């Protein structure tokens, strides 16, 4: 459960940074 959650977070963070900073 925890490794899957960590993997999900790792995939979501770059997308959030991309949207927030507008640097894609």
From Swiss-Prot:
Keywords: Amphibian defense peptide, Antibiotic, Antimicrobial, Disulfide bond, Secreted. It is found in: Secreted. GO terms for cellular component: extracellular region. Coiled coil: none annotated. Its main location: secreted. Disulfide bonds join 18-24. InterPro entries: Antimicrobial_frog_1 (IPR012520). Transmembrane segments: none annotated. Expressed by the skin glands. GO terms for biological process: defense response to bacterium. The keyword Disulfide bond applies. Antibacterial activity against Gram-positive bacterium S.aureus and Gram-negative bacterium E.coli. Belongs to the frog skin active peptide (FSAP) family. Brevinin subfamily. This is Brevinin-1La. It comes from Rana luteiventris.
């Amino acid at each position: 459960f925890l490794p899957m959650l960590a993997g999900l977070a790792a995939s979501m963070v770059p997308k959030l940074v991309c949207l927030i900073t507008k640097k894609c």
